[in-house]
Design a protein with these regions (language model features):
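Helix-loop boundary and gating motifs at the non-cytosolic
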Residues: 1-43, 214-261
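C-terminal ends and interior cores of transmembrane alpha-helices
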Residues: 67-89, 296-309
Length: 402
């Protein structure tokens, strides 16, 4: 599952900046606003779908999500054709529709997939499994980068069409092979309505957050990290294109971004492999220390990109930021699951995701406005500053564990 999702995502997103900027003509504010629409959708639906996964089935939730994601990405790839002669709906409106489908589909998968893995293999093995899954995902990303560059050179929207098809195929495959053997539904009154069952599950998840103060702090801090990384993730490609400028070589933009993404993925693969050897994924304090270090590296890389005077400096900053994200994802997932109960795992993970979505929804437009009002460089600088509170939180967590 992780391999196929990473392959589809890499195929679509490696050259997404070229498609959105050069083919669809979106400006910095619209680029961030489309992300805001996505995250607002996640904010609205994440709690509902997380409760569905904990109340009924993680497997069903994941499969539904795959088909919705496939539909959303196919729509996004079809915008060039949907806005042809005679169309009364604008390019940006179609992008908004596709982002809404993307958001709804992702909420069905988010939380449910990790909860399913942890329940099936057990908490003690989950950290190692998530690390191996990340390595497989990064390997798939390398394949997707090549596909994205090749498809984009044929026509810029083709990567999204192929990515949507891959998600639909994955949904069919999971219907056949995905099993759910360890999931236990929460007990409810026999005559309880679906709404009462889902409300009971959500309240149980909220109790878990209240009982773990540090988990509540993490949820609050994701507001800042969500706002920060939304701006960075949407704007680093346009920044290289118009803010720094690509080298004057006989190489297309698709190839440039393919090379950058491949290099970042290779760095991430090496970093994940080292993390598997050096980090005791069963030791919560060591996992927290690793998160502090990785967050420091990411913040430094984003700030470095904001002040980059030339292309070489900017590329090194982008590579370091990308590699730090690749390594931190499984480490962060492991840390969260160390503090969660099985019966409400998907619900609490969805709450964390909602907090991230709220941060992106509230802060993303501000970062985008800064880019339109002043410069993209100023947007990226503000994104780095917004991530600084995260460092204080992980430092506090480590002190609590000593």
């Amino acid at each position: 599952m992780s391999f196929m999702m990473a392959l589809a995502n890499s195929t679509m997103f490696t050259t997404s900046g070229i498609y959105h900027v050069t083919s669809l003509g979106l400006n910095p504010f619209e680029l961030v606003l489309m992300g805001t629409v996505l995250e607002l959708t996640v904010l609205i639906f994440e709690g509902i779908t997380g409760v569905v996964a904990d109340t009924y089935s993680r497997r069903i939730s994941v499969i539904i999500g795959m088909f919705i994601l496939g539909s959303g990405f196919t729509m996004e790839g079809s915008v060039l054709w949907l806005t042809g002669a005679g169309s009364i709906i604008s390019v940006f409106a179609w992008i908004v529709f596709s982002q809404i489908l993307f958001g709804i589909g992702w909420t069905f998968v988010s939380g449910a997939n990790t909860a399913w893995v942890v329940d099936e293999v057990g908490e003690e093995q989950a950290g190692a499994i998530l690390m191996r899954s990340q390595r497989l995902s990064l390997t798939a990303s390398l394949l997707g980068i090549g596909c994205s560059v090749g498809l984009s050179m044929i026509t810029p929207n083709l990567p999204y069409l192929i990515g949507g098809m891959l998600y639909a195929m994955l949904g069919v495959l999971l219907l056949i092979v995905m099993k759910e053997t360890k999931f236990k539904r929460q007990e409810h009154a026999p005559q309880a309505s679906h709404f009462k069952r889902m409300t009971g599950t959500w309240l149980s998840g909220a109790k878990v957050v209240r009982k773990h103060p540090l988990l509540g702090v993490i949820i609050a801090v994701t507001l800042f990290s969500g706002a920060a990384y939304e701006g960075y993730d949407r704007l680093w490609q346009p920044f290289l294109i118009s803010g720094i400028g690509l080298p004057d070589l006989k190489v297309s933009m698709a190839v440039w971004f393919g090379v950058v993404s491949a290099a970042a993925t290779l760095l991430g693969l090496g970093g994940v492999r080292l993390a598997e050897k050096w980090i005791d994924m069963k030791n919560e304090r060591k996992v927290s220390a690793a998160m502090l270090l990785l967050t420091m590296i990411r913040v430094a890389a984003i700030l470095s990109l904001a002040v980059a005077p030339n292309f070489a400096w900017a590329i090194v900053s982008v590579l370091i930021a990308g590699a730090s994200v690749s390594i931190s994802e499984p480490v962060y997932g492991t840390w969260l699951n160390m503090n969660l109960e099985s019966k409400t795992r998907a619900t609490v993970l969805s709450m964390v995701s909602q907090s991230d979505a709220l941060g992106q929804t509230a802060g993303g437009p501000v970062v985008g406005w800064i880019g339109s009002r002043f410069s993209i460089r100023a947007s990226i600088l503000s994104a780095g500053i917004l991530m600084l509170p995260v460092l204080a939180v992980f430092g506090r967590i480590i002190r609590k564990r000593i």
